[in-house]
């Protein structure tokens, strides 16, 4: 009889590069491959520890001199819509939702390009072509959905969210929308709709990605009640956004070896034949 040892995920660190959120800082990421029959379990386990998915990679910020990026999620049971969020829902009541398999379309890419050119022309995704866009949408080894929002009458595509379905919630991997309708608070509407989907499905959380204190691009996330942040190795309710100011309150940056050692992997990892 031949015995084989479990093949545990291998973790790596990217080279430092300019931070897209805070000027004058450098970012670095800890990452591992997401593949094989254990992909679903690994994604669930690491998402609960602040990791995010990008295609077939799971990553988490691991910067040498900064730890401002905080993984954020909404506790669906604790969420209560504010007045402005209720107005956003009313403004977008004419939109319909359609959930599909992760398959990229020309209409999605056209909307994606308009969104980037208007909102993130200097970002890391600005040069993404149609093939790279298709890879972002379609290369997923786990349960993913493309959720489209369209005008009820004209059928025009207004917004798109690439969403992963986790054991404990929905993870909004990437969202984009019609930049000409920015006054309609479409980004807020899509998050609110995901909260509704999660509630209907009995899922306790909606994962929003990273909240970065001091970054105008990420400030909107702190406006949702029921927000939790991953800090000190555990999820905790965020009570005061000002307490996490990126300049006044730099967070601890543990050595890479210690970070990897503290990662909790799934209890049962598949073995080779």
From Swiss-Prot:
Subcellular location, in the record's words?
Answer: Cytoplasm
Q: Signal peptide span per the entry?
A: none
Name the reaction it catalyses.
Answer: N-terminal L-glutamyl-[protein] + L-leucyl-tRNA(Leu) = N-terminal L-leucyl-L-glutamyl-[protein] + tRNA(Leu) + H(+); N-terminal L-aspartyl-[protein] + L-leucyl-tRNA(Leu) = N-terminal L-leucyl-L-aspartyl-[protein] + tRNA(Leu) + H(+)
Q: Which GO terms describe its cellular component?
A: cytoplasm
Could you give a single Gene Ontology term from the biological process aspect?
ubiquitin-dependent protein catabolic process via the N-end rule pathway
SUPFAM superfamilies according to UniProt = Acyl-CoA N-acyltransferases (Nat)
GO terms, molecular function = arginyl-tRNA--protein transferase activity; leucyl-tRNA--protein transferase activity
UniProt cross-references to InterPro entries, sorted A to Z? Acyl_CoA_acyltransferase, Asp_Glu_LeuTrfase, N-end_Aminoacyl_Trfase, N-end_Aminoacyl_Trfase_C, N-end_Aminoacyl_Trfase_N
The protein's superkingdom reads: Bacteria
- Family (UniProt): Belongs to the R-transferase family. Bpt subfamily.
The protein in question is named Aspartate/glutamate leucyltransferase
Q: Please give the organism.
A: Ruegeria pomeroyi (strain ATCC 700808 / DSM 15171 / DSS-3) (Silicibacter pomeroyi)
């Amino acid at each position: 009889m031949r015995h084989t040892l479990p093949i545990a995920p291998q973790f790596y660190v990217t080279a430092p590069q300019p931070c897209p959120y805070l000027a004058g800082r450098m970012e670095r990421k800890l990452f591992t491959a997401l593949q094989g029959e254990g992909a679903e379990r690994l994604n669930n386990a690491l998402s609960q520890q602040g990791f995010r998915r990008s295609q077939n990679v799971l990553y988490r910020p691991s910067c040498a001199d900064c730890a401002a990026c905080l993984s954020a999620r909404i506790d669906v049971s604790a969420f209560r819509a504010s007045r402005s969020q209720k107005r956003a829902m009313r403004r977008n009541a004419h939109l319909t939702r359609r959930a599909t398999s992760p398959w990229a379309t020309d209409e999605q890419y056209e909307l994606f390009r308009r969104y980037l050119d208007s909102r993130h022309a200097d970002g890391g995704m600005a040069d993404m072509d149609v093939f790279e866009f298709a890879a972002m949408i379609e290369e997923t080894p786990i349960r993913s959905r493309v959720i489209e929002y369209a005008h009820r009458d004209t059928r025009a595509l207004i917004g798109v969210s690439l969403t992963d379905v986790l054991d404990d919630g929905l993870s909004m991997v990437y969202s984009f929308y019609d930049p000409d309708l920015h006054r309609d608070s479409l980004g807020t509407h899509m998050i609110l709709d995901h909260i509704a989907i999660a509630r209907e499905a009995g899922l306790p959380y909606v994962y929003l990605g990273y909240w970065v204190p001091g970054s105008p691009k990420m400030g909107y996330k702190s406006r949702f009640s029921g927000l939790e942040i991953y800090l000190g190795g555990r999820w905790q309710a965020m009570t005061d956004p000002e307490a996490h100011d990126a300049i006044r309150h730099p967070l601890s940056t543990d050595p890479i070896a210690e970070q990897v050692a503290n990662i909790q992997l799934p209890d049962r990892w598949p073995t080779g034949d």
